[in-house]
């Protein structure tokens, strides 16, 4: 058990020359408790070419975080691995976890896993290549994990303490979310200096803990449920090559590529419409849900009535008040008006490819380290201030140089719609493919140049060496779009990435 208590009780000040004084006093006490009990048992057996290791255990914990809330976990686990002649490896694990976050009959989940490996470089047929192939290992695994990361007491229906009304509906059937993952990979080292690691994985999350949208007729927040399946597939490649070429010069190059794609396979009550995002079966989580467009409306799309008002021609569908220079939205469902039903799924935030590279050079007492990082194939959409007209009133934004490329009768191929004092003009602020941009980028994350002083004079005064360096963080970014940082894609109200030197 662990208890903590603290008091803040006195603070005072006085002004000696004015013969006045003031005092503040108060008291504050906090209490938390944590109970833990655990035990493990191990067994190791080795004989000739055989090696067996096994471990089993149990642990239980109870936590109180300073109020009436309490939660507890208990776990049983066992693991064993066997190695034969340093060539063949197999390992199995099983655990049974229980959580107080779930109701009776649903507290416990069982999560097994198994893994196997083959050190091919230890085989007799690899001996002729021993000097060239230092390591060659194949490995594969399959296992499951549980997720109980939800709020407390979600399995219970709660009532208002004053009038007895039910205020929160619980779900007594809520239980563990389970992740099933298969992966296969290889580790290779050639000529002692070149290392390659490749891994492919297929991860399936079932019984997802989700909260459905609020019912239109219920009038109360929905209870969490187990419903939904999401699959993540991807691969990772890691390369490393380093060598001390001469006594004075050495280098190391480390790089990697990775790709992950997720897709919703099952979802209760789908789709979940979240405005400009949507969760729909067959698409990535939180895919963009935007209005399709066809450039900007032109004067040729309208005629004028006797009052001088712009009237759209037959086949041209607009929002009320739109005129030449505004975004031309497409009536996708053909009902003769632009509504939220015209939106469609257009991409997601998950990149097509992630990559990085780290280059280190050493020459005598000099050292240089450069780190690159980037992504390709990322969908993003501009929002305020870029899609909100000038919007210079109140806490609006300063006009941008890029907004000079706005629509006029003489500049019909402009990047921006017609000038407008705020977002209410022309309905141009809706998230649409007109505001789409490719957020691919390559960034130099850091550059560091250093020099080591280690002359004998320093050692006489007890100093082994002095390392002096110049460092720059985020000095360069290469991207197609320049209006916003392509990595965090923050626009109004977000703090930009900082360059430091």
Name each model-derived stretch.
Residues 254, 341, 351-365, 445-450:
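Conserved SET/PR-domain catalytic core that frames the SAM/AdoMet-binding pocket
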Residues 1-6, 17-290, 431-501:
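Extracellular/periplasmic, surface-exposed regions of secreted and cell-surface proteins
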Residues 346-381:
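Glycine-rich, aromatic-lined ligand/substrate-binding cores of catalytic
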Residues 225, 242-349, 389, 406-411, ...:
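Conserved small-residue
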Residues 19-22, 335-340, 424-433:
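Short glycine/proline-rich turn/loop motifs
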Residues 375-467:
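Extracytoplasmic gating/loop element in the C-terminal half of outer-membrane beta-barrel translocons
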């Amino acid at each position: 058990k662990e208890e903590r208590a603290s008091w803040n009780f006195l603070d005072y000040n006085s002004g000696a020359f004015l013969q006045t004084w003031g005092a503040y006093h108060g008291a504050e006490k906090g209490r938390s408790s944590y109970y833990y009990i655990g035990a493990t048992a191990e067994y190791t057996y080795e004989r000739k070419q055989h090696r067996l290791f096994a471990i089993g255990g149990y642990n239980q914990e109870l936590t109180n975080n300073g109020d009436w809330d309490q939660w507890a976990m208990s776990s049983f686990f066992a693991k064993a691995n066997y190695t034969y002649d340093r060539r063949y490896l197999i390992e199995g694990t099983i655990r049974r976890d229980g959580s107080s976050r779930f109701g009776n009959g649903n507290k416990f989940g069982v999560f097994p896993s198994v893994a196997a490996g083959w050190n091919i470089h230890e085989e007799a047929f690899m001996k002729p290549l021993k000097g060239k192939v230092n390591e060659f290992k194949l490995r594969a695994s399959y296992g499951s994990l549980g997720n109980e990361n939800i709020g407390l007491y979600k399995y219970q229906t709660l009532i208002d303490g004053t009038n007895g009304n039910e205020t929160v509906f619980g779900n007594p059937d809520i239980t563990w979310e389970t992740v099933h993952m298969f992966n296969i990979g290889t580790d290779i080292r050639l000529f002692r200096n070149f290392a390659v690691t490749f891994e492919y994985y297929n991860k399936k999350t079932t019984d997802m803990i989700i909260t459905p949208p609020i019912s239109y007729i219920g009038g109360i927040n929905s209870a969490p449920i187990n419903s939904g399946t999401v699959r993540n597939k991807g691969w990772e490649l890691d390369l490393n090559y380093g060598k001390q070429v001469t006594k004075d010069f050495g280098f190391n190059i480390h790089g990697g590529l990775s790709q992950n794609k997720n897709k919703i396979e099952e979802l209760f009550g789908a789709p979940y419409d979240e405005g400009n995002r949507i969760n729909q079966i067959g698409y990535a989580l939180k895919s963009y849900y935007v209005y399709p467009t066809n450039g900007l409306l032109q004067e040729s799309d309208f005629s004028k009535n006797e009052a001088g008002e712009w009237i759209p021609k037959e086949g041209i569908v607009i929002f009320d008040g739109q005129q030449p220079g505004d975004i031309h939205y497409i009536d996708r469902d053909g009902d003769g008006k632009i509504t939220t039903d015209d939106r469609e799924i257009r991409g997601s935030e998950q990149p097509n490819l992630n990559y990085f590279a780290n280059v280190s050079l050493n020459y005598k007492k000099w050292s240089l380290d450069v780190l690159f990082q980037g992504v390709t194939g990322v969908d993003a959409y501009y929002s305020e201030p870029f899609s909100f007209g000038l919007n210079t009133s109140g806490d609006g934004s300063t006009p941008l140089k890029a907004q000079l490329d706005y629509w006029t009768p003489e500049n019909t191929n402009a990047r921006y719609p017609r000038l407008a004092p705020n977002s209410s003009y022309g309905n141009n602020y809706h998230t649409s493919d007109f505001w789409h941009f490719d957020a691919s980028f390559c960034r130099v994350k850091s550059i560091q140049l250093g020099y080591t002083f280690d002359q004998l004079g320093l050692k006489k005064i007890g100093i082994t060496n002095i390392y002096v360096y110049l460092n720059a963080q985020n000095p360069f970014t290469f991207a197609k779009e320049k209006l916003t940082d392509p990595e965090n894609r923050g626009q109004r109200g977000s703090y930009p990435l900082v360059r430091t030197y």
